[in-house]
Amino acid sequence: MAALTRDPQFQKLQQWYREHGSELNLRRLFDANKDRFNHFSLTLNTNHGHILVDYSKNLVTEDVMRMLVDLAKSRGVEAARERMFNGEKINYTEGRAVLHVALRNRSNTPILVDGKDVMPEVNKVLDKMKSFCQRVRSGDWKGYTGKTITDIINIGIGGSDLGPLMVTEALKPYSSGGPRVWYVSNIDGTHIAKTLAQLNPESSVSIIASKTFTTQETITNAETAKEWFLQTAKDPSAVAKHFVALSTNTTKVKEFGIDPQNMFEFWDWVGGRYSLWSAIGLSIALHVGFDNFEQLLSGAHWMDQHFRTTPLEKNAPVLLALLGIWYINCFGCETHAMLPYDQYLHRFAAYFQQGDMESNGKYITKSGTRVDHQTGPIVWGEPGTNGQHAFYQLIHQGTKMIPCDFLIPVQTQHPIRKGLHHKVLLANFLAQTEALMRGKSTEEARKELQAAGKSPEDLERLLPHKVFEGNRPTNSIVFTKLTPFMLGALVAMYEHKIFVQGIIWDINSFDQWGVELGKQLAKKIEPELDGSAQVTSHDASTNGLINFIKQQREARIQ
């Protein structure tokens, strides 16, 4: 594929931006077209609620959207989409298919990898997960002293942690009758020490989530959990009732002391950051029940079908991706804010921080050459309204343009005080995108200050500070209610957005070589931290840091 910057469709888009980009003004665009909302929004109608994607508050015209869709076609998005769904090895650096869509393929139509249908294996693992969940949640699965299981400790990192953690937090209202779930990821001993201090080994089950069963952070934490358990249990054979593995390495799982019957398999075509739909989601299923886990899969499958079959110009993941391309590659935006107005989604931005930045944080193309344009953005965000009192100042009046996605459910899980809290939340959600779009003109600010009775001197002094330029782009994503089905659909929508952008940039969204170098160097440094001898084998900075740490390890603190 030709470089993006040499693609005629991209050049056409850039030329339009150079000639007209500075003239784009959202107030004027809305004034000129009273039907703008209808022209630049989509409603996705499912049998489990509706999703409105309003992208009318973006710096686009119908001509721009046509050019963006033409760019997607020129970059081969449709063909690449089919290659993914057909099980081709689109993760070309690792020689792997990319089939998280198979994990939630509720239609059960065959999906082939190397000529073999993967669906029987997918369904076999789902059945095993269902059986295990039912046994634990019903109290049939007992600990070594006969106690029912009240707590699940999920030990993993990256995709084995962020996805399940985000989903169990998001679906807390659906957890009735399930065990509590705790997540341990950080190698920092504080994380596991604080967690285990609250738990009883007799009624806890640890899930060790590691594809290879060699991930240093996960296995170190798992061994610590086993030590903690055996301090009480004394008998290594009791491990079988309290530890399960999510892995592909049967040998290592057995060596750890886990019965292979308690090992839940997944496959090399499941990427870590796309794995919550697999056995990695066992903690989700235990917490909210397997029926709700299946609803999560069904919502994602619904979005998969929308993504695969809907024309590009009406395709939610594609449109979100193209708007991102517009801002990153024409306007030069470097960050993207995800702002869910739902406290249950408080880990949503963190989840897609990995999903997006580990996928598209690349500068080498499929042909092995360095890109000559920007790729993945910095993704960040916090739930509303907390963010309004933290960083929205910069979004409104800072010097950087930050495209934002605002998300909110129409119906709350907690309609307390006759829905007052949610009404205030909705009002703030709506006000923010309007404020970012409209801003406040000098004349409007002047009238406001005059009405407040300011003296002419104070008015002139305050006036420039009270002006909002506006013209800040946002997407509003409004959905009926945060249910398992709806969450699955939203997560899949963003997954496919990331995929589309990777295709347009001609990078591999499904490897993560950038994670490896630091891990390699850490293995070399770890033994150098032993003893008190000065270290001189690195650059001056790293040597200085190591030697300071050695010196301060034994320091007495007053």
Curated annotation (Swiss-Prot):
Please describe the post-translational modifications of this protein: Phosphorylation at Ser-185 by CK2 has been shown to decrease enzymatic activity and may contribute to secretion by a non-classical secretory pathway. ISGylated.
Where does the chain bind D-glucose 6-phosphate? G159, S160, S210, K211, T212, F213, T214, T215, Q354, E358, H389, K519
Q: Which GO terms describe its molecular function?
A: carbohydrate derivative binding; cytokine activity; glucose-6-phosphate isomerase activity; monosaccharide binding
Q: Which InterPro entries match?
A: G6P_Isomerase, G6P_Isomerase_C, Phosphoglucose_isomerase_CS, SIS_dom_sf, SIS_PGI_1, SIS_PGI_2
Q: Which gene encodes it?
A: GPI
Q: What is this protein called?
A: Glucose-6-phosphate isomerase
Q: Where is the active site?
A: E358 (proton donor), H389, K519
Keyword terms of this UniProt record: Acetylation, Cytokine, Cytoplasm, Gluconeogenesis, Glycolysis, Hydroxylation, Isomerase, Phosphoprotein, Secreted, Ubl conjugation
PTM sites of type N6-malonyllysine: K454
- Tell me which EC number(s) this protein carries: 5.3.1.9
Location of the protein in the cell: Cytoplasm; Secreted
Please give the residue positions where the record annotates the modification Phosphoserine: S107, S185, S455
What organism is the protein native to?
Pongo abelii (Sumatran orangutan)
Q: In which pathway does it act?
A: Carbohydrate degradation; glycolysis; D-glyceraldehyde 3-phosphate and glycerone phosphate from D-glucose: step 2/4
Tell me if Calcium is a UniProt keyword of this record: no
Coarsely, its chief localization is cytoplasm
Instruction: PTM N6-acetyllysine: list the residues.
Output: K12, K142, K454
KW ATP-binding (keyword) present? no
**Which reaction is catalysed here?**
alpha-D-glucose 6-phosphate = beta-D-fructose 6-phosphate
> Which residues does the record list as N-acetylalanine (modified residue)?
A2
Q: How does it assemble?
A: Homodimer; in the catalytically active form. Monomer in the secreted form.
